Curated annotation (Swiss-Prot):
EC number: 5.2.1.8
Keywords of this entry: Cell cycle, Cell division, Chaperone, Cytoplasm, Isomerase, Rotamase
Function: Involved in protein export. Acts as a chaperone by maintaining the newly synthesized protein in an open conformation. Functions as a peptidyl-prolyl cis-trans isomerase.
Protein's recorded name: Trigger factor
Taxonomic source organism: Mycoplasma capricolum subsp. capricolum (strain California kid / ATCC 27343 / NCTC 10154)
Annotated domain remarks: Consists of 3 domains; the N-terminus binds the ribosome, the middle domain has PPIase activity, while the C-terminus has intrinsic chaperone activity on its own.
Length: 428
């Protein structure tokens, strides 16, 4: 027997190839022939007793080769297992006949490769720079305005009043391109907050200054990245503005703070300080996560991976499910998505597969770093995390422990430790 092997890395598979020829193959063919003859029933003869001249009519080469294949599989597989430095397999190999004749048989044993990573450098990577985080007054005002919106009042404007940014407008509209109404361009009693950017760029800005009344026109241009039938085209919308309401926000003062009833916050100055602190923490967290993701991408570039095809298929199934759920949530059909994005089904499939593979590679990289650096969550860190959740939800620690699995907390703590390790050991 002759042994050869090959890694099909792109497919996440490997194969052992065993060739049996010469006298050895002839012996297996003889065994196959004798086994077939012993069970062959030829009219006019007892089972297995027909002469060679008669059995030859029934024992075709295909039948003979198939029977010999059944006999030779085990010794061929056992021979492959004796080979030193053979590629390790992750599941039971599937035998496939590559070539067969009266002179030889060539069998491939195809299997999944063992999932593994040979990680590249994961410390002192300087190609990704750390950025500083700042909190502007606008950032603070935006958060406080969301608080104020909880207690906002609406006051109907006079018929003679103009629309201003922030107003709530009820109106009918109908859109035209080249003087032809288009699908999806019409609605009745639509309610819109001016400045919320629900419509295409320019639509809401064009409404500013209008008053209650019928047959008012505005002109917009659809973005280039839009439904192909409308992308980049000029459009006219005829509006019937029925009602304009002013959104009245409460003042930025201690009364607002009293209404919010936040723990340990009694003045507006304290509220601003808390918001600034919270925004800074969130921005810092997001900045850190983005930096770490970019570093992981750099590590992936210099690492070698061996990923079984079955694992890719399993991950791809999850990715496709997420994609389908997102479309459902956005109330968009797959066909409409392809029309909007101008990409084909083949491109979508390729993108989803690449996403699945990237997720697997990211998992392998972080798992390897975690193992190499012995990153583990201590009992103290786990208990501290439980206390954080208890404080967040305002319930007892023991109650939190009964609601959240200990392993889930352990995983979260270790993920945070790992993220901190990567952040502190890379970039400038």
């Amino acid at each position: 027997m002759i042994f050869a092997q090959e890694k099909l890395v792109d497919q996440g598979q490997g194969k052992w190839t065993v060739t049996i020829d010469g006298e050895q193959w002839i012996e297996f063919l003889k065994k196959a022939k004798n086994r077939l003859k012993a069970n062959l029933v030829v009219p006019g003869f007892r089972k297995g007793k027909a002469p060679e001249s008669e059995t030859a009519k029934y024992l075709t080469p295909i039948k003979l080769y198939n029977e010999a294949f059944k006999i030779v599989i085990k010794p061929a597989f056992d021979f492959a297992l004796t080979q030193e430095n053979r590629i390790q397999n992750d599941n039971s190999p599937t035998p496939v006949i590559v070539k067969v004749s009266e002179k030889e048989i060539v069998i491939d044993f195809v299997f999944d490769l063992v999932l593994e990573v040979k990680i590249g450098e994961y410390k002192n990577i300087s190609t990704i720079k750390k950025s500083t985080v700042e909190v502007s007054q606008e950032d603070v005002d935006n958060v406080i305005d969301m608080y104020r919106s909880r207690f906002a009042m609406q006051k109907e404007k006079e018929v003679s009043d103009q629309i201003q940014k922030g107003d709530i407008v009820t109106f009918d509209f109908k859109g035209y391109v080249d003087d032809q109404a288009f699908e999806g361009g019409e609605a009745k009693d639509f309610v819109l907050e001016i400045g919320s950017n629900q419509f295409v760029p320019g639509f809401e800005d064009s409404m500013i200054g209008l008053k209650v009344g019928e047959n008012q026109e505005i002109n917009v241009k659809f973005p280039e990245e839009y439904i192909p039938s409308l992308a980049g085209k000029d459009a006219k919308f005829v509006l019937n503005i029925k009602n304009i309401k002013e959104k009245i926000l409460p003042a930025k003062d201690d009364e607002l703070v009293k209404d919010l009833n936040l723990p340990d916050i009694t003045t507006y100055v304290q509220l601003e300080e808390k918001v600034k602190k919270d925004v800074l923490e969130q921005k810092t967290k997001n900045n850190k996560s983005e930096f770490v993701e970019n570093i992981i991408d750099e590590i992936i570039k210099t690492s070698e991976f061996q990923i079984p095809k079955t694992i890719v298929e399993r991950q791809l199934k999850d990715v496709k499910k997420e994609f389908e759920d997102q479309l459902t949530q956005q109330k968009i059909t797959l066909e409409k998505y392809k029309e909007i994005t101008k990409i084909s089904q083949e491109e979508i499939d390729e993108e989803l597969k690449n996403d699945a593979i990237h997720r697997i590679k990211s998992f392998l990289v972080v798992s390897e770093i975690k193992n190499k650096e012995n990153i583990k969550a201590s009992e103290e860190a786990i208990n501290t995390k439980f206390e954080e959740f208890a404080n967040l939800y305002g319930i007892e620690v023991e109650k939190i422990k009964s609601l959240i699995d200990n392993q889930a907390i352990k995983h979260q703590v270790e993920s945070e430790l790992l993220e901190t390790f990567i952040f502190e050991n890379n970039g400038n």
